[in-house]
């Protein structure tokens, strides 16, 4: 084991950057967080500044070290987890971004996706990548960038431009530009990776007109990709040794190591994943087949079924920033609890289209059932219920695809702290919901992958031992009431 005893988890999310420092018992000893700017240049467009993301990462690393009372030399390894699908281009030599990154929520390529579907390519895309043709994924974003950024394609064809999702950008910056890599979990979200070979697909790359020379090397989720160089708060030579997309890292952090084990993360969006073992399970119910992780460079690959809802916590942020009915996101729980029900108001959180299992990019958010008795409290409660009802749809699709029931539902992410939301989720699912003590399971998963890659741990069993439940929510709703909620929800979704 290295002399240093701590692992740093860099968790780069959609609205901000978290850094956590954990000891070898997986206890958090220091943490920090910093929001960064969301750019909305046009309706349905969402962008991030790559340089601002990196600046927030360096700031958070310094603050987390300070909060832990540690120095950079105390860090034995770094693990990364990240918002997936968000797409960036930068110059290979200088690291200068060619533009803002296009965020996973961005819908600007909806027309391009419609044309691809009309060409009849979606069945083949599903077969090769496990994904659907949707603006959500990196591939069409990358095509758009090459079509609209002057000179970008020619530079990429010469090998002068790097493409990367956020994990790739962070490793590039951490290693002083030495490593241009991604891991299998992030690569599986691009529309460009073959799920079977775990390599870039020439067929998909040709379909999307993506130059091969810009693509990063695909690696495992727990191995050394490079070492730190030129950092402000960390010495040179610390191994960057683990990475996974945020939802896969959360599945790992929730100790879902056996086929059939599942979790749902409530963050900006909400994402339900089920471990399906060493073979990919193809979906016929509108879900995605994705890579969960591969431990080591040549280890066994674990796959997952995923249901992705684009808007969860983001709906609460919209209530705060757009409608201005609350001052802080946590305030929504007290407002919603001030009424006994939603007053028959239903909210469909299609603020960025509808994701799985519907896949309707043209859908828009909807409040249904409003009358003169409706108050902002009813609307707040409907927002929380809408988040839970969309997860019910994902869980039903997952049961059909996997042939497995979900006997216990593990929840994590920031919005999982909301007791009203968690109770309603258990009610509409009709199964117990378990919330862990550590809600930031993405960071836990990233830290453990980094520690595995650097040799601090030699198996995932330590994370299973470290996992502890904080509270179990048992369903209380009567079946007939549940069916009424679901019927109203179904009608509202059809109108969205």
UniProtKB/Swiss-Prot annotation:
Question: According to the UniProt entry, how is activity regulated?
Answer: Inhibited by fructose 1,6-bisphosphate (FBP).
| Residue numbers binding glycerol | 84-85, 136, 246-247
Gene Ontology molecular function: any one: glycerol kinase activity
**Binding residues for sn-glycerol 3-phosphate:** 14, 84-85, 136, 246
| Any Pfam family | FGGY_C
Keywords attached to this entry: ATP-binding, Glycerol metabolism, Kinase, Nucleotide-binding, Transferase
Enzyme Commission (EC) number: 2.7.1.30
Alphabetized InterPro entries for the sequence? ATPase_NBD, Carb_kinase_FGGY, Carb_kinase_FGGY_CS, FGGY_C, FGGY_N, Glycerol_kin
Q: Where does ADP bind?
A: 14, 268, 313, 414, 418
SUPFAM superfamilies xref list:
Actin-like ATPase domain
* GO term, biological process aspect, one: glycerol-3-phosphate metabolic process
Q: Choose one Gene Ontology CC annotation of this protein and give it.
A: cytosol
Which reaction is the catalytic activity of this chain?
Answer: glycerol + ATP = sn-glycerol 3-phosphate + ADP + H(+)
Tell me, in a sentence or two, what this protein's role is.
Key enzyme in the regulation of glycerol uptake and metabolism. Catalyzes the phosphorylation of glycerol to yield sn-glycerol 3-phosphate.
**This protein's name:** Glycerol kinase
Encoding gene (name): glpK
